[in-house]
Amino acid sequence: MKAPIPHLILLYATFTQSLKVVTKRGSADGCTDWSIDIKKYQVLVGEPVRIKCALFYGYIRTNYSLAQSAGLSLMWYKSSGPGDFEEPIAFDGSRMSKEEDSIWFRPTLLQDSGLYACVIRNSTYCMKVSISLTVGENDTGLCYNSKMKYFEKAELSKSKEISCRDIEDFLLPTREPEILWYKECRTKTWRPSIVFKRDTLLIREVREDDIGNYTCELKYGGFVVRRTTELTVTAPLTDKPPKLLYPMESKLTIQETQLGDSANLTCRAFFGYSGDVSPLIYWMKGEKFIEDLDENRVWESDIRILKEHLGEQEVSISLIVDSVEEGDLGNYSCYVENGNGRRHASVLLHKRELMYTVELAGGLGAILLLLVCLVTIYKCYKIEIMLFYRNHFGAEELDGDNKDYDAYLSYTKVDPDQWNQETGEEERFALEILPDMLEKHYGYKLFIPDRDLIPTGTYIEDVARCVDQSKRLIIVMTPNYVVRRGWSIFELETRLRNMLVTGEIKVILIECSELRGIMNYQEVEALKHTIKLLTVIKWHGPKCNKLNSKFWKRLQYEMPFKRIEPITHEQALDVSEQGPFGELQTVSAISMAAATSTALATAHPDLRSTFHNTYHSQMRQKHYYRSYEYDVPPTGTLPLTSIGNQHTYCNIPMTLINGQRPQTKSSREQNPDEAHTNSAILPLLPRETSISSVIW
């Protein structure tokens, strides 16, 4: 049924009236061109989409039905881009179809991207607008295209709704849509404060971990429609002005400089979240902005964002004076402001007087630091430094030039077959390792009582004389030494006690193990307090036997300085011939040899050979005994005389006592009386007949 002619005229008038309301943007061939519409369609490949002619949704006050009734026709054209050739669209009716004022794609393909122009016209009027369609693919491994996302912001601890955008064309009014939500393309167990309402996701209390990409998925026929929204969480909108961090508002900051130098004034401030408003921070000198100053040497840097979190920012701006002149000195103010207010703080650029306080303090600080470093090095490596100095620049001690021995070694003698597992290492160290190292490696001359002492009177007086002839007294505190009270000899003899108390001799006490709990240990502590010049050195077991250990360095440091010189063969033989008992040692050794030779002279030949080999092998195994060998002339006789039960006497030529060997004469030249003319009767003490003390 056709409409009455008056009605058509009225409709046409109304339509043309509406066309005149909108301002024209362009005109070509009498057709008004509104260029490209602000609404852009973005879909993923394979999704359906409906493109509506925008003329009926904002450009004219009518709809498609009225326009069609007024005799206007709707035409669609496609072009690749603005200004390109437009060609009419041939609709196939299946994948791409024209339905009233829209074009439907079911589904879209990549080649569907472009500009779609809808034109309504008749013989008198023409109007045109273009709509953009972009078809894209998902990013690799994701369910969305990062260039086709929607963006939303939410304030911390407040509520936020995220809508599934542009799905109105796929919803049925009589049916609730079935929409699935994903976060970062993964299904998620949502917390109770997140609820779903039709096509929206409601977060009742936004948290910082709600930041992310939310994707809604809707099924439409045999197709899937997805929309992705990126949610950004910010701090709550601030209602306070910015806060100045430096310089402070409450006081005037003074910055000193010298004329001709470069000056840099930095202002830092904190800005709360103010939406999309950029922070405003700037410098002024008096009432002038820096840009208004005539000097090009004074300028502002760009605003730098130092920190940013949830929209809150810490920013800074610098005022630079390239070469300070007298006119540049003065008061500069830093201003910060936002929609809630303004704050400012001042810096006084002041000329610095020539003072050397800082330089002097720096120099003194450097010297103090150097002294601290040197003291620390000296504390840690004192012994090594002193040993190095003594070895290269030191001189031997002069106080002990009249003394024959470097040290008197006091220890407890325990035979090796009596060593047990617990004290074996200590005894081996005291009897073997310690003397060997001091004599053979460091070249010290030790007085070892068990080896060097030849009693001439009372035993205690002999020990006192030997200690007096030594520069140091070394006491080796082994468990056996403590149990047997080996130091008692130094307390009994008055001369020895006075030497310890007055500091006449320096004592080196070597503790070989943990002595606490051992019987008589309290007396050891009392002895330490009695000795005036005492050094205690700990021996911590076999690890201290290494040559480079701290133990030997400390011991060498406490011993008298002695340059290590190569020991010749003759010196090695005569190492113990000096001192107050040198001659007696020689005589003792010779007398022992003589006694042994005489005893063997009357023995069976096989017994003599066996005893000779056994004796010398045992004497060489124990280094702390020194053997003296003398070849008795075959024809010589050494008569032995026994007086009582106390001593054994031996007739020895005086030439042997003086350390000389007789020159052998022929039997015709030799005087029969010479063999006994220069002879002497010397006693063989009980010690020379294998009886010796235990503690020395």
UniProtKB/Swiss-Prot annotation:
Transmembrane segments: 358-378
Matches recorded under Pfam families: ig, Ig_6, TIR
Region entry Disordered, spans: 659-680
Cytoplasmic side, ranges: 379-696
Broad class of the protein's primary localization: membrane
Tissue-specificity statement: Detected at low levels in heart, skeletal muscle, ovary, skin, amygdala, caudate nucleus, corpus callosum, hippocampus, substantia nigra and thalamus. Detected at very low levels in tonsil, prostate, testis, small intestine, placenta, colon and fetal liver.
Name by which UniProt lists this protein: Interleukin-1 receptor accessory protein-like 1
Protein's organism: Homo sapiens
